Amino acid sequence: MALAARVAVVGHVEWVTFARVPHVPRPGEIVEATESWDEVGGSGAVAAVQLAKLAGKALFFTALGSDETGSRAEDRLRELGVDVHAARRDVAQRRAWVHLDDEGERTITPIGERIVPHGEDDLPWDELAGVDAVYFTGGDVAALGHARRARRLVATPRAYDTIAGSGVDLDALVRSAKDPGEQHAEEGLDPAPDLVVATAGKEGGEWIGEDRSTGKWKAAELPGPKGDSYGAGDSFAAAFMFALGADLPIDDALALASRAGAHKLAGRAAYDGQLTAADL
């Protein structure tokens, strides 16, 4: 299946230290890591890399710290094939600590200020007018307005504080059906998103249209043994946005997104196993 779409992400980046442990430490417990490594991560970064693999090119509008870690993050994103447009902030780059347990589940502790792009940043925002779809994970209201210039705009509840009250219409909001922090996030948005996609992991999920039409999808089978869950949700959302940008019907777009989530879930954090154009 040959698909084409011009895609972009507006959002945030973290520099992540992963530690593989038998289980997440209980209060007062010391648990030895069997493996550890550093990698660029965060919702925006994971989505941008997934989109670069599917579309061949992905624009990423972001903001980074002015320290060496911020520079490492930008360099690594470019190595992963992302076209990075980053404003610099006079703060330390946001980091995160991620435990990966024997079940592949991730437990995340962010460290530092969440750094997001602003619409007044000197970035090539006009390029978004020629984009088919944008995934928005963070930024101010002006940055969200720039993102809305694309044909399709998909967002995560992580950007709720910006989206709520902005008056910007979303083509889709992709949220968790199980996370208490994301359940029913659409209820506070005006205008309401045209489409709400509620993911439920191995149970698949459900979509709800603005006209109250609904549908469900089944989770795709893993292409191999279960790996790390880190990045699976954002890989799903990015692939769904890519499919919308390529004008696939909702059910087909969700089937593709489900495959992307399953492929990532069968890989190592943060990017191994992500779906590519060759897999379509």
Report the location of each language-model feature.
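Conserved beta-alpha-beta core of the PfkB/ribokinase-like small-molecule kinase fold
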Residues: 131-195, 202-206
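Structural beta-sheet core signal
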Residues: 9, 60-62, 155, 173, ...
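Hydrophobic anchor at the start of a short beta-strand
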Residues: 7, 57-58, 84, 153, ...
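Conserved N-terminal subdomain of the carbohydrate kinase-like
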Residues: 27-38, 53-132
